[in-house]
Swiss-Prot record:
GO molecular function, one term: interleukin-1, type II, blocking receptor activity
Pfam families: ig (PF00047), Ig_2 (PF13895)
Name assigned to this protein: Interleukin-1 receptor type 2
Any single Gene Ontology cellular-component annotation: plasma membrane
Gene assigned in the entry: IL1R2
Regions of this protein lying in the Extracellular compartment: 14-347
Organism: Chlorocebus aethiops (Green monkey)
Position of the signal peptide: 1-13
Length: 393
């Protein structure tokens, strides 16, 4: 997109000059190879889109740039003047029909008076045989026991501005009938619906689009290798924390984890989030004092858990009047748990005050008991001394 901007803006200050007389023509860097390789069948139409110019931008960009094609670093532009199978149109290079000898690297060059770059595209044309199938097939994956959709790929250049395109689908080279309850081709789209995907649905599929050009009909074939993956099990999520009331001192930093038990279920499709007074945390605390922490997924004893903490930095009196709720949802169920933040009870305790009094009471009581016992012992000793005198009398 940046290159397109430079190309368009460059014409506002410069008049487009012939390519041979510009500095850009003398130095035109190659930006690299397009990530996608084009694997096509011999005898069918091929359209190579210039990577620098998407179709939706062609109308606005085309008046300001010069677009050319070359093959295999050759100085000769394609298509040649006498070439009847190949032409350039709306930012794409068309080959109709394509031959194996057309295989190679095609370089799209875009330039104006002040800018120029090149991007290459790799094209390989295969003979239409079973041996070519692994090379030209698009891998697509559906999940077992679900409703799936296969897509006939890379047809945009041939279906653009056309509503009458008809696609015939095949499985293992056998046509899929219209009355087939398992497969349904959606008219006007490139989609094949697959009901209740089964393991035996795996294999090679072929979609064929009929394309008309100058009164002649051509087939455009795309092959798909369907792979089936097992459906990951899901269980009903259960929130096991937090507690209904959390104690925290004003001014302290607090983290309240919302921990969810999933058992053997997958955490990938389970959503977990917090609210404050039935509002998203980001909306309730736009300043970011209270936020959701990063999501954690882990296993304990071969059982899966997910956790999202609610972080207070710090706790203020406003938080004491809020109701916080943790929500969890997946395809099996939905659950919520509420919690509130409260100040801890005062640290003053009557036990601290009464403990010294109790100790003093015990000490005084001990002294009183000691004196009483000593007084009684003294009386007993006096009686013992008087007995002999009574006997003498």
């Amino acid at each position: 997109m940046f290159r397109l901007y430079v190309l368009v803006m460059g014409v506002s200050a410069f008049t487009l000059q012939p390519a041979a007389h510009t500095g850009a023509a003398r130095s035109c860097p190659v930006r690299g190879r397009h990530y996608k390789r084009e694997f096509r069948l011999e005898g069918e139409p091929v359209a190579l889109r210039c990577p620098q110019v998407p179709y939706q931008l062609w109308a606005s960009v085309s008046p300001h740039i010069n677009l050319t094609w070359h093959k295999n670093d050759s100085a000769r532009m394609v298509p040649g003047e006498e070439e009847t199978r190949m032409w350039a149109q709306d930012g794409a290079l068309w080959l109709l029909p394509a031959l194996q000898e057309d295989s190679g690297t095609y370089i799209c060059t875009t330039r104006n008076a002040s800018y120029c770059d090149k991007v290459s595209i790799e094209l390989r044309v295969f003979e239409n045989t079973d041996a070519s199938l692994p090379f030209i097939s698009y891998p697509q994956i559906l999940t077992l026991s679900t409703f799936g959709v296969l897509v006939c790929p890379d047809l945009r250049e041939f279906t653009r501005d056309k509503t009458d395109g008809k696609i015939q689908w095949y499985k293992d080279f056998l046509p899929l009938d219209k009355d087939n309850e398992k497969f349904l081709s959606v008219r006007g789209t490139t989609h094949l619906l697959v009901h209740d995907v089964a393991l035996e649905d795996a294999g090679y599929y072929r979609c064929v689009l009929t394309f008309a050009h100058e009164g002649q009909q051509y087939n455009i074939t795309r092959n798909i290798e369907l792979r089936i993956k097992k459906k990951k099990e899901e269980t009903i999520p259960v929130i096991i924390s937090p507690l209904k009331t959390i104690s925290a001192s004003l001014g302290s930093r607090l983290t309240i984890p919302c921990k969810v038990f999933l058992g053997t279920g997958t955490p990938l499709t389970t959503m977990l989030w917090w609210t404050a007074n039935d509002t998203h945390v980001e909306s309730a605390y736009p300043g970011g004092r209270v936020t959701e922490g990063p999501r954690q997924e882990y296993s304990e004893n071969n059982e899966n858990y997910i956790e999202v903490p609610l972080i207070f930095d710090p706790v203020t009196r406003k938080d004491l009047n809020m109701v916080f709720k943790c929500f969890v949802r997946n395809t099996m169920g939905f659950q919520t748990l509420r919690t509130t933040v409260k100040e801890p009870p005062p640290t003053f305790s009557w036990g601290i005050v009464l403990a010294p009094l109790a100790l003093a009471f015990l000490v005084l009581g001990g002294i009183w008991m000691h004196r009483r016992c000593k007084h009684r012992t003294g009386k007993a000793d006096g009686l013992t001394v008087l007995r002999p005198h009574h006997q003498d009398f």
